[in-house]
């Protein structure tokens, strides 16, 4: 197990508490509607599906309260700042915000399915009870709607034998909002798959804004009061457990039982979602305000492999290493905002991003900046926002792993290190950095070469050659490149990058790398930072667990992954 417990105990505890609250709320609501005398007559028509529908509704309210919080980026950045002196275990939980957002969404889907299925049975029971002519208690209760609805005594929402379930579904507030919410939820979930987010980000972006219809629908879903229970006054006058068996004698002079009166369950969903909705509205207002501040593009560089570098200035902009921003180009799309990691260092007088062509929006943006005689497109920026990479200097030893354009957060870190060396910063806690960059194309290395060359020279001059150990891996090589590398193996610099460190072909042998690091730093706390695909994250996470020790006096690896 290695230090799996050390890395994940708080996450597991948090999930257990969240799941426990879901179970508690479901069971508590189920027993309430299954046992309470107030809903005795309602159960005579619907049975236990009433309790299932109401229990799932309560869990939907609870999870809908939580769903917006993990995507309040300014709130997370604020918490990250206030938790700067908290334990790394607690701070790491903020990096799992999107994972928790997805888990809450899955729970909403589960309870939505339970709620819909339960109400399908409920409407079927309502319909059959309304059609019944056998004089049973259910049929008598269903007929109360005929002439006493104005008095508040109706129980069955199907008001006549000619009314269909479909008609009630699309004409009642509960039915219509339920359909709208379900359609919005289905579209949001299906468009949030990794394939669509990676290949058709604009589809994901637009459909996810259907949450507005989901939240509005949830807020007014219960206004119609379709689920009804006996009023307190009516129960005091005619208790259901005493009077249900003598329903044929209701209102007889010689009987103490009177015809029951019912009232709708007051809407509660709006109470659950009000606070997070207000918080999210404030979040969006802040985003809008910051996005309207003028951004000045000071430099545009087109690197090989279709990588665009933008250097910008913005009044009041302050950043930390590894942070990211959201970028909008109104001339391409007014509503689309895309996240990009900052590649500049906090010590620089500008902030920069590197954009690789990966989809329609990025391709259009690069094409717009390639037009030499056209005016530079206007750019809007929101951020910056914090990520796991902010904590890199909290570790004695840091392992940085970037795949392709995923190297961008580490560009910021390495630049900041260069400036710290320039200023002789003695507060730098980090004593060793291992940097791995995995790329398919040789051209991708070019824009990073100058930085690595400068770092090599700076560390040589300061006598800190061993501070940075970097390895570049080329996965898209062919026999010509390998042959050329073999012929020039004795050269002092690499033929691909021009750096002193030779490029490796293929992928890293992570077990060997971690074993070497663990041996070299037997008593250190090692932070492993990744910006790359899920498969690579899985391999690195396993290695962190395998080569860590529960003994705090021995080496421990803490895995961190960029999520935005």
UniProtKB/Swiss-Prot annotation:
Q: How is it modified after translation?
A: Phosphorylation at Thr-430 mediated by PKC/PRKBC positively regulates its interaction with NOXA1 and enzyme activity.
Q: Name one GO cellular component term.
A: early endosome
Q: How does it sit in the membrane?
A: Multi-pass membrane protein
Task: List the carbohydrate attachment sites.
Answer: 162, 236
Keywords assigned: Cell junction, Cell membrane, Cell projection, Electron transport, FAD, Flavoprotein, Glycoprotein, Heme, Iron, Membrane, Metal-binding, NADP, Oxidoreductase, Phosphoprotein, Transmembrane, Transmembrane helix, Transport
**How would you summarize its activity regulation?**
The oxidase activity is potentiated by NOXA1, NOXO1 and RAC1.
Q: Which Gene3D superfamilies match?
A: Nucleotide-binding domain of ferredoxin-NADP reductase (FNR) module (3.40.50.80), Translation factors (2.40.30.10)
Any ranges marked Extracellular in the topology annotation, and which? Answer: 31-44, 124-168, 228-396
Q: Per UniProt, what is one GO molecular function of this protein?
A: superoxide-generating NADPH oxidase activity
| Reactions the enzyme catalyzes | NADPH + 2 O2 = 2 superoxide + NADP(+) + H(+)
Q: Which residues carry this modification: Phosphothreonine?
A: 430
Q: Where is this region: Interaction with NOXO1?
A: 397-536
Q: Please identify the protein, giving its name as recorded.
A: NADPH oxidase 1
- Organism this protein belongs to: Homo sapiens (Human)
Gene expressing this chain: NOX1
């Amino acid at each position: 197990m290695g230090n799996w417990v050390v890395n994940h105990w708080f996450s597991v505890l948090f999930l257990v508490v969240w799941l426990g609250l879901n179970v508690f709320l479901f069971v508590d609501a189920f027993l309430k509607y299954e046992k309470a005398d107030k809903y005795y007559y309602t159960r005579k028509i619907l049975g236990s599906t009433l309790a299932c529908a109401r229990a799932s509704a309560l869990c939907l309210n609870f999870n809908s309260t939580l769903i917006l919080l993990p995507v309040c980026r300014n709130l997370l950045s604020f918490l990250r700042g206030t938790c700067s002196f908290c334990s790394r275990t607690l701070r790491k939980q903020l990096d799992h915000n999107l994972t928790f957002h997805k888990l809450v969404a899955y729970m909403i889907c589960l309870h939505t399915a339970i709620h819909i299925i339960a109400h399908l049975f409920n409407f079927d029971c309502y319909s059959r009870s309304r059609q019944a002519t056998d004089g049973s208690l259910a049929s008598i209760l269903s007929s109360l709607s005929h002439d006493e609805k104005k008095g508040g005594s109706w129980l069955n929402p199907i008001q006549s034998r000619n009314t269909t379930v479909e008609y009630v579904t699309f004409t009642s507030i509960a039915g219509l909002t339920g359909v709208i919410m379900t359609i919005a939820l289905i579209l949001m979930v299906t468009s949030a798959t990794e394939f669509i987010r990676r290949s058709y980000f604009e589809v994901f972006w637009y459909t996810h804004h259907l949450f507005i219809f989901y939240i509005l629908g949830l807020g007014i879903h219960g206004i119609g009061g379709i689920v009804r229970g006996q009023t307190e006054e009516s129960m005091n006058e005619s208790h259901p457990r005493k009077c249900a068996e003598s329903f044929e004698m209701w209102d007889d002079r010689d009987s103490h039982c009177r015809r029951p009166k019912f009232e709708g369950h007051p809407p509660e969903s709006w109470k659950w979602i009000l606070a997070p909705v207000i918080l999210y509205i404030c979040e969006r207002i802040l985003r809008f305000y910051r996005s309207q501040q003028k951004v000045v593009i000071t430099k545009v560089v087109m690197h090989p492999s279709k990588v665009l570098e933008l250097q910008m200035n913005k009044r009041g902009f302050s950043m930390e290493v590894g942070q990211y921003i959201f970028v909008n180009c109104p001339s391409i799309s007014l509503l689309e905002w895309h996240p990009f990691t900052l590649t500049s260092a906090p010590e620089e007088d500008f902030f920069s991003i590197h954009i690789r062509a990966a989809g329609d929006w990025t391709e259009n943006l690069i094409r717009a900046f390639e037009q030499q005689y056209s005016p530079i497109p206007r750019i809007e920026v929101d951020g910056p926002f914090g990520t796991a990479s902010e904590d890199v200097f909290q570790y004695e030893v840091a392992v940085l792993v970037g795949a392709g354009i995923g190297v961008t957060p580490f560009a910021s870190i390495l630049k900041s290190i260069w400036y710290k060396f320039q200023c002789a910063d003695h507060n730098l806690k980090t004593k060793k950095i291992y940097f791995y960059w995995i790329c398919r194309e040789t051209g991708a290395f070019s824009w990073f070469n100058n930085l690595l060359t400068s770092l090599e020279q700076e560390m040589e001059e300061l006598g800190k050659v061993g501070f940075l150990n970097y390895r570049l891996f080329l996965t898209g090589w062919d026999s010509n490149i390998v042959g050329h590398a073999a012929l020039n193996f004795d050269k002092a610099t690499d033929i691909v990058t021009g750096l002193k460190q030779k490029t490796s072909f293929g992928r890293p042998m992570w077990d060997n790398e971690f074993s070497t690091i663990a041996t070299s730093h037997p008593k250190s706390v090692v932070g492993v930072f990744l910006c790359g695909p899920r498969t690579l994250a899985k391999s690195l996470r396993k290695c962190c667990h395998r080569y860590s020790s529960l003994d705090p006096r021995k080496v421990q690896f803490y895995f961190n992954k960029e999520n935005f």
